[in-house]
Amino acid sequence: ETKRLRFQVEKVLQMSMFERQKATLKMKEIDANELISGVINTFALKVERYNGKITSNLEATDPVIFADEMHITNVIFNLMDNAVKYKKPEEDLELKVRTWNESGKLMISIQDNGIGIKKENLKKIFEKFYRVHTGNLHDVKGFGLGLAYVRKIILDHKGTIRAESDLNVGTKFIIALPLLKNN
């Protein structure tokens, strides 16, 4: 299931990044808490394989957004997949996923205890084809499109995304999306 989803994510990444225009979005009403729960369930086995654990705190009382289900699923999957890819080899992975409401928006955060990102690299991580050099620490495959895709999809949904990170402590991605009622 995880492999199938990764293949789908890669395929969508390749397609959408080489189209200059907005991704074609099939917008509909979505309960983001439900969608995120689904991704967490799909991902749980993979995280357990690394002796990791996912804790979720889906506290948004209004989780309803107007969004493209496949693309938002890919965004959540991609950020969680990065947490696995960039985990510390000597430490069990801890993944914290949270939703809440703040000033008319749905907020989503995905936090890990991985290798983290240097401050000077942080502003570049959303650029197309940019990859942080991690040495030979990880068997990380890909095109450096993941976060560029994530950012593009969030922006196409009139949202924002930012990252906070401390080297050797971990990374936290924070997404803000407009609620359906405010869209």
Positions of PLM-derived features:
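Short alpha-helical segment of the dimerization/phosphotransfer core of two-component systems
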Residues: 1-5
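Conserved micro-motifs of the catalytic ATP-binding
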Residues: 20-25, 64-67
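Conserved catalytic submotifs in the C-terminal HATPase_c
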Residues: 26-31, 48, 53-63
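Short beta-strand/loop element within the Bergerat-fold HATPase_c
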Residues: 92-104
